[in-house]
Amino acid sequence: MRTRVSGWLLAAALVVHLLALYLPGSPDPGPDVVPHLDKLVHVLLFATPALLICRITSKWWPIVAMAAHAPVSELVQYRLVPHRSGDVWDLVADAVGVILGLGLASLAARRDAGASPKLGLPYGEGLEQPR
């Protein structure tokens, strides 16, 4: 059941991911209300699918595809999407997002296996289970 829900969440996350990356930008975007907020958005756009992919499958190729999609998306934005620009720092934020998604998936897997998130030890080896 959890895999089915994760699959639907992944599909939704990928739709948001693709729309956010490839919709044309505004010809006059105006001033940044929050400086560098776009970098946080890039991190989240790549971390969310990476996390969900890891929750669904142990295959490595979808994560490689996510990582490869980062520079491709920046090139497409730079060359093909009106009023968008490719940016090296966006690419860095995309890579950070993939790594963050992998890390969060690893923490979730440890938690699901009954390990302590702090030490990676199973409960009962000198640690009390939280109440």
Residue ranges: model-predicted function:
Residues 32, 61, 116-120:
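Membrane-interface helix-loop junctions in multi-pass transporters/channels
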